[in-house]
């Protein structure tokens, strides 16, 4: 291509987090200023840009493929095949980039992930979801050490699994030493390990003082799953400064746009207790967004962040959810940073049948009732038959008291679900977002999700990553699994539930607008006049099965990512 010129909450915490919407609104007007300084600032990136000579899949319902897209002040003003017509939309000559035939799609929307957790990781977090051997791991870590100061931890916490490596194991202490002789390294799988470290990391972990140390590390660098991994992760978290978290937020955003993911509906975290029992999915729910908001306030935000608020109040006396609903606002912010709903939990998951009268079920119903009465969107998490039955039956009970059919309540993940419950959810105005987390460690008897059944049913359906604890964030790895049914071990486990490549990208773009809701639905996910100019230009032609085989889908990334007409990633 070429171109021309983290404790329990006090009321103060709750009010602070409730004011997050206001913080988002306050930060966002500055957020676009740096990226769009040449265009007078504004509330979000607002660039002038023409992309020409591309295979640009607009993803509108007629699915035209065009060669030219023009973006003025951050909004698309022309799609078609005439550059001369595009140029008429501008008073001053815009920047123009020749895509040289490259395939482009709308900026990817991930409607369920944990990018805020990723940005709050300790150390220099280094995604390994694109590594397929120990040698790849070493190469990735070695590259990261060129950025990390000597002595700083290079870490990977979640988002990968040794099943994806040719050797089907984690790297050893010696192998990590070879990759990073001057940096401690810590790699941890999933929520609670197992983990591995190198010599410098071993020395650090074995010297952690009590009561939460030391960490037991094997001669080969291995750290057992559970308490020992919990101690290790905690020791690293206790070293985090706010500046570290700001750097992590920037790194997370840079990684996302390198994949072409421009919009993220973040689904929160479990409330951290500053204890070894905290896993990779724990953080301070009342402060975790602040590093991101600070970065946006600096004008360095390069993704669109949508924020759901996760609630797991097991104590009947807890006022957290009620205070949230009283002190925050849904869908509040601007095109760059905006609040969403309650999710991916409204309370601990109920048990089937929801009408059992158990204390847990009563608490869940009361929480859902509060959300419905406040007219908020809700998203819940289903990993089993018990989960989806109790939750969808619970939705129906709540709907009889406070109608939810226009609120778009969502069930997420669904490695399994029966079509009668899909129909029941659809009748309640709900939707389902699916994730391919079974790719890492699924088996023929524990596969899913039922992509094909859901797509054919007609319920609002979206694709998400749930990255990055137990799943990769990379949408192209998820597209690989959704279109092949093959897991990381190379075993076909979900072959009767496949999507086409076109369907997978539609779910990651246009269809995911439904899950954002509000004004976003008509502004994102499609390249058409009046919509925001978010584009991902790919390194491979995703749609050409002849030239890009199934295995190559996992190698797709973005060579050029545009947010509101501003180039936020350029790897040409």
Regions found by a protein language model. Name each.
Residues 6-15, 33:
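Twin-arginine (Tat) signal peptide motif
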Residues 18-23:
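Sec-dependent signal peptide hydrophobic core
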Residues 24-43, 540-543:
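C-terminal region of N-terminal signal peptides and the immediate post-cleavage residues
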